[in-house]
Amino acid sequence: MAELTVEVRGSNGAFYKGFIKDVHEDSLTVVFENNWQPERQVPFNEVRLPPPPDIKKEISEGDEVEVYSRANDQEPCGWWLAKVRMMKGEFYVIEYAACDATYNEIVTFERLRPVNQNKTVKKNTFFKCTVDVPEDLREACANENAHKDYKKAVGACRIFYHPETTQLMILSASEATVKRVNILSDMHLRSIRTKLMLMSRNEEATKHLECTKQLAAAFHEEFVVREDLMGLAIGTHGSNIQQARKVPGVTAIELDEDTGTFRIYGESADAVKKARGFLEFVEDFIQVPRNLVGKVIGKNGKVIQEIVDKSGVVRVRIEGDNENKLPREDGMVPFVFVGTKESIGNVQVLLEYHIAYLKEVEQLRMERLQIDEQLRQIGSRSYSGRGRGRRGPNYTSGYGTNSELSNPSETESERKDELSDWSLAGEDDRESRHQRDSRRRPGGRGRSVSGGRGRGGPRGGKSSISSVLKDPDSNPYSLLDNTESDQTADTDASESHHSTNRRRRSRRRRTDEDAVLMDGMTESDTASVNENGLVTVADYISRAESQSRQRNLPRETLAKNKKEMAKDVIEEHGPSEKAINGPTSASGDEISKLQRTPGEEKINTLKEENTQDAAVLNGVS
């Protein structure tokens, strides 16, 4: 700003040092030295240029000079007009022209100068030029050092940026400066832009150098990603790199695109490792047995899709038989997965676990097939895990107790008698069983019409058998009047023939089946029950024979059989006879008085043989 130094005349006539800030039509904006006065506009007639710095100082007595002095301590020093009165060595006695003639002062030679011969400035004393500054260069142009060479080239007194007008101001005392500014302005702005770019690169390089020096002593990892996987590693719009840079402790991530090398720098090993997990994409394969490929894929790819979703891999493909890019084992198909190392590890765990599960299931299936094959070879029924199976020897029905357990009075000799009696059964018994199995009554399972003899019915109901048991002396023919059809009470009352032997035979058959109870409700839809709520095989046999005799025998034979039937029923419920499917009824104390004799048993056997030829077997299954 020395080139734009001016002297401004004060109100006391002294000239004070100032600096031109702007040029106007008829005034100048002046800033005073040390800001002893505020910035203000000064008319041209109060401003003059300072004398040349190389002026010769030849002062003698009587010459007019200017003294650098001040009127008081509050004002700065200025140039005051004075006259030399006396000289003595380096000291001069001066007399101020603006003051009283009697006011003299002794000053040194350095404070004196010849009178300034410059006149006050005019409109054409200073020239101002403006250059519009682009937006990207405004910040750079605010620094006056950026215009140092330009100022020297155009011969300007001052160049500065005006933020309000966004223009570059060029002030000069020469008219030639205006022409040079018009010629060099574009070049100057272009050079500023180039300098800015170079300076920015230098600053970035400097920062990178400092950062590299710091990172050299920190944690870092370097790895290479395949070129075809580089897009996955970078992510959409660099999302993966941004995510890795956000990891706490990561200071820098560098990528060499030519070699596909990532370099990660961080404050700790964990931070660097975590950032690497976001960027390191690999391709790996897993061998799957050929016979399990379909099950690994699943219906509509459901299984493999679930594995992909849970593991986090990006994609999966199955290598075809005509592809030989990967090593292939016999009987194996490679599954190729692409993803981060963590996701590849996850998919290996999931797939290996699923394959192990499928192999175990296949092994269990083969064991089942071998068991079925062995069952077929030994002629047994094919294994079935459902339906009615064999009952064990300790099985007990929910409707009564096992007769062998509830009647401990039976001796081993009676068992032998039963086994011998069972051997007497002939073809007629097998035929009756065949007819029973071929026909069933439609009455419903285990229910009689009266409702007192079916499963779940009252134990003390008024059935035909219970009435006979309660009153053995009553008329047995009353049973016919109390029956509702030929398929109810008469069926139970017809047990007069072979009831004892048939019960023993049925017991013999059950003994072959581990002496288990037989639930009559599962064998017939219209089975009747005894007073204990259970059905015996003898019930079915006697019922079928009684029905056939009632339809085919004469009236006299029928009446005779009914008399004997009542007697046999009473004997059959005696304590000496073991119940087949449960304990005896509540009236067993009265019935236990009636004992069957060997003679009566023989008579019943003969009567059955006499009537068996005339009877038509009408059993039901």
UniProtKB/Swiss-Prot annotation:
Modified residues (Asymmetric dimethylarginine): R447, R453, R455
Domain KH: 222-251, 285-314
Biased composition (Polar residues): 394-410
Region (CC1 domain): 201-208
Post-translational modification: Phosphorylation at Ser-420 by PAK1 promotes its relocalization to stress granules and activity. Phosphorylated by MAPK1/ERK2, promoting subsequent phosphorylation by GSK3B. Phosphorylated by GSK3B, promoting ubiquitination and degradation by the proteasome.
Quaternary data: Homodimer (via CC domains); homodiremization is required for FXR1-network nucleation. Interacts with FMR1. Interacts with FRX2. Interacts with TDRD3. Interacts with HABP4. Interacts with CYFIP2 but not with CYFIP1. Interacts with EIF4G3; promoting translation of target mRNAs. Interacts with ELAVL1. Interacts with CEP63; inhibiting 'Lys-63'-linked ubiquitination. Interacts with PKP3; the interaction facilitates the binding of PKP3 to PKP2 mRNA. Interacts with PKP1; the interaction may facilitate the binding of PKP1 to PKP2, PKP3 and DSP mRNA.
Residue intervals passing through the bilayer: none
Keywords: Acetylation, Cell projection, Cytoplasm, Developmental protein, Differentiation, Isopeptide bond, Methylation, Myogenesis, Nucleus, Phosphoprotein, Repeat, RNA-binding, Spermatogenesis, Synapse, Ubl conjugation
Region entry RNA-binding RGG-box, spans: 442-457
Role: mRNA-binding protein that acts as a regulator of mRNAs translation and/or stability, and which is required for various processes, such as neurogenesis, muscle development and spermatogenesis. Specifically binds to AU-rich elements (AREs) in the 3'-UTR of target mRNAs. Promotes formation of some phase-separated membraneless compartment by undergoing liquid-liquid phase separation upon binding to AREs-containing mRNAs, leading to assemble mRNAs into cytoplasmic ribonucleoprotein granules that concentrate mRNAs with associated regulatory factors.
Region annotated CC2 domain, chain positions: 353-379
Statement: the UniProt record of this protein carries the keyword Phosphoprotein: yes
Annotated domain remarks: Disordered region at the C-terminus undergoes liquid-liquid phase separation (LLPS) for the formation of a membraneless compartment that stores mRNAs. The tandem Agenet-like domains preferentially recognize trimethylated histone peptides.
Compositionally skewed regions (Gly residues) per UniProt: 445-460
Recorded family membership: Belongs to the FMR1 family.
Segments of skewed composition (Basic residues): 499-509
Residues with N-acetylalanine modification: A2
A Gene Ontology term for the protein's cellular component: dendritic spine
Gene3D superfamilies on file: 2.30.30.140, K Homology domain, type 1
Domain Agenet-like: residue ranges: 4-50, 63-115
Cross-link (Glycyl lysine isopeptide (Lys-Gly) (interchain with G-Cter in SUMO2)): K56
Protein name, entry field: RNA-binding protein FXR1
Ranges of biased composition (kind: Acidic residues): 483-493
Disordered, as annotated region: 381-530, 545-621
Family annotation (SUPFAM superfamilies): Eukaryotic type KH-domain (KH-domain type I)
